[in-house]
Regions:
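Short loop/turn segments immediately following beta-strands, especially the blade-tip
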Residues: 109-114, 121-123, 174-186, 287-290
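Conserved beta-strand positions in repeat-built beta-propeller and related beta-rich domains
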Residues: 38-42, 96-100, 156, 164-167, ...
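Asp-box/WD-like beta-propeller blade repeats and closely related beta-sheet repeat scaffolds
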Residues: 22, 43-44, 49-93, 97, ...
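Beta-rich, blade/repeat-based domains predominating
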Residues: 13-39, 75-94, 124-161, 169, ...
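Beta-propeller fold detector
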Residues: 1-14, 67-71, 115-130, 182-198, ...
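Blade-level signature of beta-propeller repeat domains, shared across WD40, Kelch, NHL, RCC1
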Residues: 249-290
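Short, solvent-exposed loop/turn segments at conserved positions within beta-propeller repeat blades
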Residues: 47-54, 99-100, 167-168, 220, ...
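Beta-propeller blade signature
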Residues: 52-64, 107, 112, 272-289
Length: 290
C-alpha cells in the first residue's frame, strides 16, 4: 500500500491549507470511463467543514493524474458532509449525498457548477419514528440517538433513476434523474417526483449490477441483500465478518467487493470502549446471475 496520489496530498494536519490535500476522504468511486472520483467532505468528526476545503476530485486511472477538482463553497454550508457519489459519464453529471443536513448535490461536470436540491424533503431526512437497533441496543453516540440523513446513493445502469436513502432508517427512495438535472424546474415539482419505495434494509452504501439488481448491506444483521428490478428484497449472504458493510465496487468479471467500516464498534457508540478488530478487511464474492 502507498499514499494516493502522493505523499503531499496525504500530508494534511490541522492548520494546513486543505484545498489541495485530503482532509478526510469519505468515498471513492470508479465510473464507466475508468476515472476515479474521490469525495473529501473536509469535515473532521462530521462537525464543521475545514477552511472551505470540501471537494470532489477526478483522477484519470490510466495516468493517475488529477483531471478536475470540483468545489462547493457557495453551495454547501460549513455543517455539510458530502458522503457518497455516483457519476453519469454519458450525461456528464455527478450526484452526491449530504448526510449531515440532508440533500442531493447535482454537479454539471461540463460547466463545473453545482446545486443542492431536495434539502427540505422528508426523503433526505431520518425518519423520526424509526428506532435504530444495532448489536441488540439502540444506536447512540455519547448517550444520544444517532440520526443521520441522506447517505447511500446508487444510479441505475441506464442513468435514468437515482436511488438514495438516509443512513439511520430503513426507507428507500428514488427519483428520475431528469428532475434533478433540470435547473429550471420549480422545487415543488421536483419534490413531487420523489417516489417512496417503502421499508427495506438499514444500509450504508449500495450499488447496482448490470442487470439492475440493487445490492445493499444490512448492517443490523451482518448481511448483504439485494433488491430486484421488481423491487423484491432477497438475501444474498449473511456472515459475521460483515460488520457494517459500507461501500462497494463491482468488477467486470462479476465480483462484488465490500469494505466493512465497523462503525458500530467505535468508542463513540460503545461508552468509550473500542470494539473494533484489526486489520480492516475488504471482502469479495462472486455475484449470482452475472
Amino acid at each position: 500500500m502507498k499514499p494516493y496520489p502522493d505523499n503531499q496530498w496525504n500530508s494534511w494536519q490541522e492548520g494546513d491549507d486543505g484545498t489541495n490535500k485530503w482532509v478526510c476522504v469519505q468515498a471513492v468511486y470508479v465510473d464507466a470511463e475508468n476515472n476515479l472520483w474521490v469525495v473529501d467532505p473536509a469535515c473532521p468528526n462530521m462537525e464543521q467543514v475545514y477552511d472551505a476545503s470540501v471537494k470532489l476530485v477526478k483522477f484519470n486511472l490510466a495516468t493517475n493524474r488529477i483531471e478536475d477538482v470540483y468545489r462547493f463553497e457557495d453551495v454547501l454550508s460549513n455543517k455539510s458532509y458530502i458522503n457518497d457519489v455516483r457519476v453519469d459519464t454519458h450525461r456528464q453529471v455527478a450526484y452526491l449525498t449530504n448526510s449531515n443536513e440532508g440533500g442531493i448535490v447535482v454537479v454539471n461536470l461540463e460547466t463545473g457548477t453545482s446545486r443542492q436540491v431536495l434539502r427540505n424533503h422528508p426523503s433526505v431526512k431520518h425518519d423520526p419514528s424509526f428506532t435504530l437497533i444495532v448489536d441488540g441496543k439502540e444506536f447512540k453516540k455519547q448517550g444520544q440517538p444517532v440520526h443521520l440523513q441522506s447517505d447511500g446513493i446508487a444510479l441505475t445502469p441506464d442513468g435514468e433513476w437515482l436511488y438514495y436513502k438516509p443512513l439511520t432508517d430503513n426507507k428507500l427512495y428514488r427519483i428520475r434523474t431528469d428532475y434533478l438535472r433540470n435547473e429550471a424546474l420549480p422545487d415543488d415539482q421536483r419534490e413531487a417526483a420523489v417516489e417512496d419505495l417503502g421499508q427495506f434494509a438499514v444500509t450504508d452504501g449500495m450499488i447496482f449490477d448490470i442487470n439492475g439488481n440493487l445490492y445493499l448491506g444490512d448492517y443490523q444483521h451482518d448481511k448483504l441483500v439485494r433488491l430486484t428490478p421488481a423491487h423484491k428484497l432477497e438475501d444474498v449472504v449473511a456472515d459475521e465478518r460483515l460488520i457494517w458493510p459500507d461501500s462497494y465496487s463491482m468488477s467486470t468479471d462479476g465480483y462484488l467487493y465490500i469494505s466493512c467500516s465497523q462503525i458500530n464498534k467505535q468508542p463513540d457508540y460503545n461508552e468509550g470502549e473500542n470494539k473494533r478488530t484489526t486489520p480492516y478487511a475488504i471482502y469479495r464474492m462472486k455475484l449470482p446471475d452475472t
